[in-house]
Design a protein with these regions (language model features):
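Conserved small/polar residues in nucleotide/adenosyl-binding loops
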Residues: 194-201
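Anionic group-transfer/hydrolysis microenvironments
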Residues: 62, 115-116, 199
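Conserved kinase catalytic-core helix
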Residues: 122-157
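Conserved short submotifs of the Hanks-type protein kinase catalytic core
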Residues: 109-117
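Conserved NTP-binding catalytic cores of kinases and kinase-like/nucleotidyltransferase enzymes
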Residues: 1-108
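Intrinsically disordered, low-complexity segments enriched in glycine and mixed charged residues
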Residues: 178, 183, 190-191
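Coupling/switch/interface segments within P-loop NTPase motor domains and analogous charged loops
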Residues: 149-179
């Protein structure tokens, strides 16, 4: 398994995508080098932006070690679940999902269109920026993806197969404990820390 870095990600992309311009002005950056407002605040995967001036790509790799260097045991299959979820959503609402270019199961990497020309809405909304189409787009995305992946539309076997396929208790615990418990202190929450620790203990029993 290759471990991607800023130094080798361009060669990797060239080996996977035949449309990538070998002679272009190639630019590479790693998610996390920019501000939270530019990059978001993910801390699990290693993500790179690669551009040849014409194509703008996101290259995302799952590794055993989190980008944040946290003490987590990570599920290496999480990249495939994310890719599969995006693939399903792209089949339902293709205009609302980044283009999917490649999924490399051997190296646990997938490549998508980079849509960083868009702004992360939560930061913009906090500034009072309004988007007239946002509510309609969110409503259409939620309604369509929820309906067409539900038992109202799918036969029971297909629905249950999908439910089992996307179960990932390891990542769920990491997000619930890592994001909502260990990052919280009594100074920045109205919920008591004792209550949060009790919840963490409960989760360990499940």
């Amino acid at each position: 398994m290759i471990t991607l870095s800023k130094e080798n990600v361009v060669d990797y992309v060239k080996s996977r995508l035949n449309f990538f311009n070998l002679n272009g002005d190639i630019k590479v950056s790693a998610i996390g080098e920019g501000s939270v407002e530019e990059d978001g605040d993910g801390f699990i995967n290693f993500v790179y932006r690669v551009s040849d001036g014409e194509h703008h790509l996101i290259v995302k790799q799952s590794t055993l070690e989190a980008r944040s260097k946290g003490s987590f045991t990570l599920d290496l299959n999480r990249y495939k679940l994310e890719y599969d979820a995006m693939k399903i959503c792209a089949a339902i609402v293709p205009d609302l999902i980044p283009k999917l270019y490649d999924c490399d199961e051997e190296n646990r990497v997938f490549i998508t269109e980079d849509v960083s020309y868009l702004r992360i809405s939560r930061f913009q909304l906090l500034k009072g920026v309004t988007y007239p189409k946002l509510a309609d787009q969110i409503a259409r995305y939620m309604a369509a993806t929820q309906f067409y992946t539900s038992e109202y539309y799918l036969d029971t076997k297909r629905f249950r197969d999908l439910s089992v396929h996307f179960m990932n208790t390891t990542m769920r615990k990491i997000m619930e404990v890592g994001m909502f418990l260990t990052s919280v202190t009594p100074e920045d929450t109205a919920v008591s820390y004792t209550h949060l620790r009790a919840h963490e203990t409960l989760m360990n029993l499940v």
